[in-house]
C-alpha cells in the first residue's frame, strides 16, 4: 500500500511526525508543491494522511504550498478523497470536514495541541506538561496502530488515550472529539 502524508511544515505540529514514522512505502509532503500536484499525488496513492492545523473547511497550507490559498485540503479534494477508505484526518475540527463530505477514515475533532488552545477551550491554568503528555500520548498510540485499519486505530486510540484522559483534562477534552 502506498501512503501519501500531507503535513504542512510547522514547528508547532512536529510532534505529529511520530504518527507516520513506521509507515512503509510513504511519500511525505510538507510544502513546496501546488494544489494540482497534491491532487495528482492523491490519485497515485492508496491511502492519504493529512495532519496539521485546520478548521471545518479543511487542512491549512500555512503558507507552505503554492497556488492553494488558505487550505491545501478542502472541498476541491473531496472527490479524490472519497475514492479512498482508510484516510487519516488529524487537525482541529477535521470531524466536521469528514462528516459534511461523508468521507471515510480515522479523524480528530477539536484536538488541543497548544496551551493557548486549552485556554480558548475553557481550561485556564493548563500547563505545557499537560499539553505535551496529551500530544505525545495521542501520537504514540496512533503510531502504534497506524498500519491497521481505521476502525482498529479508532478503537485503540479511544481505549488507550482514555487512560491518559483519566488524569489529564487536556486529553479528556480532546478525547471527547475523537
Residues of each region from the PLM?
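Helix N-cap and loop-to-helix transition residues
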Residues: 34, 73-74, 149
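A domain-level signal for caspase-like cysteine endopeptidase catalytic cores
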Residues: 1-51, 88-94
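Polar low-complexity intrinsically disordered regions enriched in Ser/Thr and small residues
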Residues: 34-35, 55, 112, 125, ...
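Conserved small/polar residues in nucleotide/adenosyl-binding loops
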Residues: 176-178
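A glycine-rich, hydrophobic loop/mini-helix early in the fold
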Residues: 45-65
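Catalytic cores of nucleophile-dependent amide-cleaving enzymes
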Residues: 9, 61-136, 141
